């Protein structure tokens, strides 16, 4: 009976360690300061081209309004993909995961993510944090 309990406890601890390791796969790709006026050239350039399968957006400071986003891949043709993003993100709010590389070509790496948008309801600039999952 003691060995069954020990085995069960070991499996439970292994499961916890497994899940925490997966949670650490999410990486902050960068933070963008959102101006007060609508801007369509806000770019997050990744210094090292990396495979990113999905992203989350968080309004770290202030509310922001987004009108578009695109992902650019390192490829001979400079391929890109428009993203379906929410139009507003309130301070402290995080979006659901937004899938990229949806054409099943998971070998393309992301070199740049661009955004169009601005800060709303604040005299300070809002900040947009981009979290990636590979």
UniProtKB/Swiss-Prot annotation:
InterPro entries attached to this UniProt entry: UPF0412_YaaI
Coiled-coil features, chain-numbered ranges: none
NCBIfam families from the UniProt entry: PRK10154.1
Keywords: Signal
Signal peptide stretch: 1-23
A Pfam entry, by short name: DUF2541
Family, similarity comment: Belongs to the UPF0412 family.
Protein name: UPF0412 protein YaaI
Top-rank lineage group of the source organism: Bacteria
Organism, scientific name: Escherichia coli (strain SMS-3-5 / SECEC)
């Amino acid at each position: 009976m003691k060995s069954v309990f020990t085995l069960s406890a070991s499996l439970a601890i292994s499961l916890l360690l497994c899940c925490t390791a997966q949670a650490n796969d999410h990486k902050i790709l960068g933070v963008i300061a959102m101006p007060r006026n609508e801007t369509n050239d806000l770019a997050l350039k990744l210094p090292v081209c990396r495979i990113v399968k999905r992203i989350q957006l968080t309004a770290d400071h202030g509310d922001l309004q987004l009108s578009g986003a695109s992902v650019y891949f390192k490829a001979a043709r400079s391929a890109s993909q428009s993203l379906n993003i929410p139009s507003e993100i309130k301070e402290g709010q995080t979006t659901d995961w937004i899938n990229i590389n949806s054409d099943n070509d998971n070998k393309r790496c992301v070199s740049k993510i661009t955004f169009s948008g601005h800060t709303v309801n604040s005299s300070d600039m809002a900040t947009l944090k981009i979290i990636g999952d590979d």
